[in-house]
Regions:
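A composition/biophysics-driven feature that prefers long, compositionally simple stretches
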Residues: 1-113
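A short, terminal or domain-edge coil/loop segment
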Residues: 17-34, 120-122, 142-148, 176-183
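Generic preference for flexible, low-structure residues
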Residues: 20-23, 41, 81, 101, ...
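Short catalytic-site patches enriched in acidic/histidine residues
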Residues: 74, 87-94, 98, 129-183
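Active-site pocket-lining segments that scaffold enzyme catalytic pockets across diverse folds
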Residues: 111-119, 131
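C-terminal helix-coil-helix/basic helical segment that borders enzyme active sites and/or dimer interfaces
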Residues: 122-129
């Protein structure tokens, strides 16, 4: 099978316009608690039926399919429909590790934006600034360079640096304090 189908959120189908790696774009249905609330089981049943019908057309009944990160009820439902379920995390991660020239350009651009953002952050360190204010300098600098969001707010100061993995907060930075940043 050479076709690549992108199931996109309703109203976002246009985002794939012009991508030569996508054969067709279809509106996705969502089976998450956020989208479905207490009706999640009904949404999961609809999702199972829709994707099961599609899979039977594309690869046949009782085919082996790889799944990465899917609701347990959906995996069970697809098994009940006769599909053989395999964990696809390993092959998916190995495939993600291979980078094209375009991806390498994006990574390089991201690193430049991050380095420039960290430089701006370092210049903004002063007693009395809150961790949140200091964090916002990094985020603003990265976005101003057409970068993307910062995923985890791992900047802390003083006693908050140990134990590690405490997110940025309203704490005011004091003179001669250690400031820890994880990019």
């Amino acid at each position: 099978q050479q076709d690549t189908i992108l199931f996109e959120f309703k109203g976002c189908e246009h985002l794939a316009s012009g991508l030569n790696t996508i054969t067709s774009v279809e509106t996705s249905s969502t089976a998450s608690f956020v989208a479905s609330g207490i009706n999640i089981e009904e949404k999961e049943k609809q999702w199972i039926q829709n994707i099961s019908d599609r899979l039977q057309t594309l690869v046949g009944a009782k085919a082996t399919i790889g799944i990465e990160r899917l609701n347990a009820n959906i995996s069970i439902g697809l098994q009940d429909k006769g599909f053989v379920i395999k964990d696809a995390q390993l092959p998916v991660e190995l495939a993600r590790a291979i980078k094209s020239q375009e991806e390498m350009k994006c990574i390089h651009s991201s690193l430049q934006a991050t380095e420039n953002g960290v430089h701006q952050l370092k210049k903004s360190i002063k007693p009395g600034i809150s961790e949140n204010e200091l964090w916002s300098v990094l985020h603003q600098a990265i976005i101003a360079q057409d970068g993307d969001y910062c995923e985890t707010r791992l900047l802390s100061s003083g006693q908050k640096t140990n134990p590690w993995f405490q997110e940025t907060g309203p704490r005011l930075i004091q003179e001669n304090e250690l400031i820890a940043l994880d990019t």
